[in-house]
Amino acid sequence: MQYFWSMELLKKIMDSQPDIRFTDGSLAIQRARMVKTPWEIERIRHVCRITEQAILETGKTIVAGETTEKDISKGIAMRMARGGVDKISYLTVTSGIDKYCTFNTYATDRVVQKGEYVLVDISGHIDGYASDLTRVFYLGTVPREEREMAMTASGCVAAAKEAMKPGVS
């Protein structure tokens, strides 16, 4: 979240208080917000669990040659709302070779096909705490070479997680 005052309002406040020195505290606030309490961590985990469950349950309903990107998007949004999510910042569902490198696009009436990937990128919120998940489904049996690439990517993610420690940014 970002909070900004208009320049006009800030000038009025500063003019009305000539003996007070105003200092930009946004960096200090940003740093303080990076540290989460156990309660905040649990809120984030909670919304992530709901988001993950909505994606997985919807993924089980995908039928190649029948399901559209919009069907997938609606299914995820409905399940998230049922789970208690009060806001969805974005919900991207893309499929088909022409859209593999296209992020943050709206779901279309395009029917997903066997042998394709379906990418879901979503952020849901509960009480101001957000999830941010990306998941990929493959419709059919993943080819060997692509499984190997996925395993390599998974190893990179595991190494990055291992390197993460409190205080490291």
Language-model segments: which ranges?
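Active-site neighborhoods and metal-handling regions in enzymes and metal-associated proteins
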Residues: 1-169
